[in-house]
Swiss-Prot record:
The keyword Membrane does not apply. The lineage of its organism: Bacteria, Bacillati, Bacillota, Bacilli, Lactobacillales. HAMAP family: Lys_tRNA_synth_class2. It comes from Pediococcus pentosaceus (strain ATCC 25745 / CCUG 21536 / LMG 10740 / 183-1w). Mg(2+) 2 binds at E415. This is Lysine--tRNA ligase. Homodimer.
Amino acid sequence: MGEKQQPSMNDQLRVRREKMQELRDKGIDPFGHRFERTHLAAQLHEKYSDMTKEELDEQGVVATIAGRMISKRGKGKVGFADLKDRSGKMQLYVRKDVLGEDVYKVFKRSDIGDFLGVTGDVMKTDMGELTIKVTGLTFLSKALRPLPDKFHGLQNVEQIYRQRYLDLIANDDSMDRFRKRTKIVSAVRRYLDGNDFAEVETPVLHTQAGGASARPFITHHNALDINLYLRIALELHLKRLIVGGMERVYEIGRVFRNEGIDTRHNPEFTMLETYAAYFDFHDVMDETEGIFKAAVAAVSDDGKITYQGTELDLGQDFERLHMVDAIKKYAGVDFWPKMSVEDAKKLADENGIHYESWWTVGHIINEFFEEKVQDQLKQPVFIYGHPVEISPLAKKNAEDDRFTDRFELYILGNEYGNAFTELNDPIDQRARFEAQVAEREAGNDEAEGIDEDYIEALEYGMPPTGGLGIGIDRLVMLLTDAPSIRDVLLFPTMKPID
């Protein structure tokens, strides 16, 4: 005798539709209505798990729960099942002599994946498992497709991302990660709200792409007959609000960049940007550290986490290091002495650093950092003092105008935050925009254009301001030990199946 052959998918779909019709023939709606429950599974476990079988029998606790049936066993007149709701699962003990033949048959003919509502006595089995002995059963919704195999979960990575709902049903780790994401974002909001920042919403459709160096998505507004850009950053509208006197603002919103997809990039992602009048970049470092400590507290009691095997301590004070000092420390090259582009290119050649023909000294300093230093930064460190050439919206440093009052937060060689003392001089801002236009003409297709409306806003006066950008998805990846950005996006961008 060979193994019992599994029914084909077509057979399973047909049988489930037949069972749906059986319910209708009995006058039961296979896609039911509102159901009032008294408890979630976890509440029952929390309240009654420590009680003995006898204590529970004596108390006579009755509960009503609802959820998806994820397993079922038993023969004849007695059956067991596991019902899963958003909090966890609960075992059901179902007897024909308690429910009556008709209702018991509804249970027996139900499939894994169906939704049931049950009322019954909370008890413990002889094995000590908290269980509901069902006295009433309501059929709530028929699953016309079988769930992924419960023992193997959902293994196909492509299917996990395309059909996240199946992943959430099958993989508790995945559900837990997205719950943590919600807690992390809430913690960030609470921190900012508690520091008197106002949450605002700014336009997603822009007449000009700005605030970052990135390729935008372009769409067309039919009534106005103009092209619009999906925002590549939140920055320029938020700074207009600082001009308007709001003083402390933040936005958590979707941003869109028409670029490649990899483990750290998705075309649409969630950004946090904050702006505070009268802050400089040192104040923003303190703010950033506060945000990260608030976020990690949502998932860790002591500020320690492990990311892909490396233990990180986000509870400690974060190190602060100038980019030039970091290059000196990790690569042994000193960019403090002023030098010509030729001198910088010579240093690049000697150290095997790539450069483009149009680059200036600042671009080469940045490339040294990215190639020689970045990967060595493991524990949290603020790298500040970026060259002016790569920071078109940051204020120049008062002591050395080759550099800006800007920082990035690095953890495990990856950037988790970008901030600066904002450029509030409209004349300098125009010159920076014009330099970007020149770069674009020289071949940099990610350089920004001139935003005249933004310059006009600056001309009305913007107080000294500190600004910050944090990629929420990357923050969640870090705090939930997720190897890919797709693991923290409920519905990542996927190429359609033909």
